Amino acid sequence: MMDGVEGGTAMYGGLETVQYVRTHHQHLCRENQCTSALVKHIKAPLHLVWSLVRRFDQPQKYKPFVSRCTVIGDPEIGSLREVNVKSGLPATTSTERLELLDDEEHILGIKIIGGDHRLKNYSSILTVHPEIIEGRAGTMVIESFVVDVPQGNTKDETCYFVEALIRCNLKSLADVSERLASQDITQ
């Protein structure tokens, strides 16, 4: 881990990327919290990946643990969504607020404000960046978070659990995006 980003930050863009990560993925982490960031490289163009990520009202399009989502009001900054979680996880619902949606910089920020789970004071930032993978348009996705460490758990246990969820979401995002990109190429 370099500057809290798995896989390092200097690989794509050098110092510019390090500065970008420090600017957009810096979370104020209190004593009882943990924070981390993960990187996923996707073999699909940015516009396609962003079209999935930006849909605050439809996280189930790529998040495998979401069965249903209801947005209260229009999907704009400050909007709330009620997410139903599939069985098998230690939760059934999560109430989340859209904190940031920047279509020019490709930044999405979400804060969990309720639900029947242990992710208290959870806040995440997801950014999407163009890159070239194997000579084609690709996308680098960075997702960072901060969350309270539940009583009875360690920082390492909490980070491990949240990182596992994010890895699943990012893998699914890559699978869906790459499938859609291959359909675009063949059509």
Curated annotation (Swiss-Prot):
Keyword Ion transport (UniProt): no
Site feature Involved in ABA binding, where: P64, I110, V162, L165
Tissue: Expressed in root tips, vascular tissues, stomata, flowers, pollen tubes and developing seeds.
Disulphide bonds in the chain: C29-C159, C34-C159
Domain of life: Eukaryota
Entry annotated with the keyword Disulfide bond: yes
UniProt GO molecular function: abscisic acid binding; protein homodimerization activity; protein phosphatase inhibitor activity; signaling receptor activity
GO terms under biological process: abscisic acid-activated signaling pathway
Key words, A-Z: Abscisic acid signaling pathway, Cell membrane, Cytoplasm, Disulfide bond, Membrane, Nucleus, Protein phosphatase inhibitor, Receptor
Position of sequence motif Gate loop: 87-91
Annotated spans, START-like: 27-178
Compartment annotation: Cytoplasm; Nucleus; Cell membrane
Binding-site residues for abscisate, renumbered to this chain: 63, 91-96, 118-124, 143
Positions of short motif Latch loop: 117-119
GO cellular component: cytoplasm; nucleus; plasma membrane
Site keyed Involved in interactions with PP2Cs: positions: P90, T154
Comment on protein domains: Upon interaction with ABA, the 'latch' and 'gate' loops change in conformation leading to a tight dimerization and the creation a surface that enables the receptor to dock into and inhibit the PP2C active site.
Family as reported in the entry's similarity comment: Belongs to the PYR/PYL/RCAR abscisic acid intracellular receptor family.
Function: Receptor for abscisic acid (ABA) required for ABA-mediated responses such as stomatal closure and germination inhibition. Inhibits the activity of group-A protein phosphatases type 2C (PP2Cs) in an ABA-independent manner but more efficiently when activated by ABA. Confers enhanced sensitivity to ABA. Can be activated only by (+)-ABA but not by (-)-ABA.
Assembly mode: Homodimer. Monomer. Binds ABA on one subunit only. Binds to CARs protein in an ABA-independent manner, both at the plasma membrane and in the nucleus. Binds specifically (+)-ABA but not (-)-ABA. Interacts with HAB1, ABI1 and ABI2, and possibly with other PP2Cs. Interacts with TOPP1. Interacts with DDA1.
Family annotation (PANTHER family): ABSCISIC ACID RECEPTOR PYL9 (PTHR31213:SF99), OS08G0374000 PROTEIN-RELATED (PTHR31213)
Name of the molecule in the record: Abscisic acid receptor PYL9
Gene: PYL9
